[in-house]
Swiss-Prot record:
Processing and modification events after translation: Phosphorylated by STK3/MST2 and STK4/MST1.
Name of the featured protein: Ras association domain-containing protein 2
Quaternary structure (record): Interacts directly with activated KRAS in a GTP-dependent manner. Interacts (via SARAH domain) with STK3/MST2 and STK4/MST1.
PROSITE patterns reported in the protein's UniProt record: RA, SARAH
Domain Ras-associating: 176-264
Listed GO biological process terms: bone remodeling; canonical NF-kappaB signal transduction; homeostasis of number of cells; negative regulation of non-canonical NF-kappaB signal transduction; ossification; positive regulation of apoptotic process; positive regulation of JNK cascade; protein stabilization
Gene Ontology cellular-component terms listed: cytoplasm; cytosol; Golgi apparatus; kinetochore; nucleoplasm; nucleus; plasma membrane; protein-containing complex
InterPro entries: RA_dom, RASSF1-6, RASSF2_RA, SARAH_dom, Ubiquitin-like_domsf
SARAH domain mapped to chain residues: 272-319
Subcellular location field: Nucleus; Cytoplasm; Chromosome, Centromere, Kinetochore
Keywords on record: Cell cycle, Centromere, Chromosome, Cytoplasm, Kinetochore, Nucleus, Phosphoprotein, Tumor suppressor
PANTHER family reported for this sequence: RAS ASSOCIATION DOMAIN-CONTAINING PROTEIN 2, RASSF
Gene name per UniProt: Rassf2
Length: 326
């Protein structure tokens, strides 16, 4: 059998494949929609594997609070290689630990050394009214290098706070705070992660939680494709979220990818989603119509089998009346 002319297939889930040409058409439409924006996707081939990579928008759909990890002052943070950012690692030791600030010895300065403003100083003079004679008392000149500064250990400087924030993303401007470390992100607010088409749903979940230093386990959450019609489709652990987003289309007014709790959300099929947005009186009228249609079908079946029953009985009677032939 000749396989040379078979189209290349791209995996899009467990035991699910699609032609590469079809995916490229979807990708072209996706990039045209986001032309000139950072949400455009790029593709490449690496060791005969077709890979798409870029940013994926994910909306927060959590109902319960999440816990942010506490920032560890001794956490190992690698300074960026840029020479202009040397200060981000200036407090790190050889093993990546934070060094304690050195305290210079404090020099005590007596009140005599400091002149008091507003008071006249009288120097001793000779009896002939000559210029005052300066005493040879040694004076201690205070300079910045002579006086050490005591820093309180429990207070972070502005540079320390900037360093911490550089290594921690915020959720809608919310950074870790010991008073607000447990909170619920605003429903529908959007974040994004940079992923590729080979990353499965669990991998994307772990990447998202690690980006914001969320302490909760990835097993508590799931990714859902939510349509404006109300349809909710949960992405399986074998699915590729970036491929799913491309196949759904780029417009987020039609469908979005949501991060939700596993035990709080149920999938809604397309057939059920058609009726979700109707009011109760309308839904009751639908039920009444369906009941009437069901009654008509039942009555039709009863008439059909009643006729069949009569035909069988007539035939049995005819057989009984006919004399047996030898």
């Amino acid at each position: 059998m000749d396989y040379t002319h078979q189209p290349a297939l791209i995996p899009c889930g467990q035991d699910k494949y699609m032609p590469k040409s079809e995916l490229l058409l979807h990708l072209k439409t996706y990039n045209l929609y986001y032309e000139g924006q950072n949400l455009q996707l790029r593709h490449r081939e690496e060791e005969d594997e077709f890979i798409v990579e870029g940013l994926l928008n994910i909306s927060w759909g959590l109902r319960r609070p999440i816990r942010l990890q506490m920032q560890d002052d001794h956490e190992r943070i690698r300074p960026p290689p840029s020479s202009s950012s040397w200060h981000s690692g200036c407090n790190l030791g050889a093993q990546g630990t934070t060094l304690k600030p050195l305290t210079m010895p404090t020099v005590q300065i007596s009140e005599v050394d400091m002149p008091v403003e507003g008071l006249e100083t009288h120097s001793p003079t000779d009896s002939r009214g000559l210029k005052p004679v300066q005493e040879d008392t040694p004076q201690l000149m205070r300079t910045r290098s002579d006086v050490g500064v005591r820093r309180r250990g429990n207070v972070r400087t502005s540079s320390d706070q900037r360093r911490i924030r550089r290594h921690r993303f915020s959720i809608n401007g919310h950074f870790y705070n010991h008073k607000t470390s447990v909170f619920t992100p605003a429903y529908g607010s959007v974040t994004n992660v940079r992923i590729n088409s080979t990353m499965t749903t669990p991998q994307v979940l772990k990447l998202l939680l690690n980006k914001f230093k969320i302490e909760n386990s990835a097993e508590e959450f799931a990714l859902y494709v939510v349509h404006t019609s109300g349809e909710k489709q949960r992405l399986k652990s074998s699915d590729y979220p970036l491929i799913a987003r491309i196949l759904q289309g780029p417009c987020e007014q039609i469908s979005k990818v949501f991060l939700m709790e596993k035990d709080q959300v149920e999938e809604v099929t397309y057939d059920v989603a058609q009726y979700i947005k109707f009011e109760m009186p309308v839904l009751k009228s639908f039920i009444q119509k369906l009941q009437e249609e069901e009654d008509r079908e039942v009555e039709k079946l009863m008439r059909k089998y009643t006729v069949l029953r009569l035909m069988i009985r007539q035939r049995l009677e005819e057989i009984a009346e006919t004399p047996e032939t030898i």
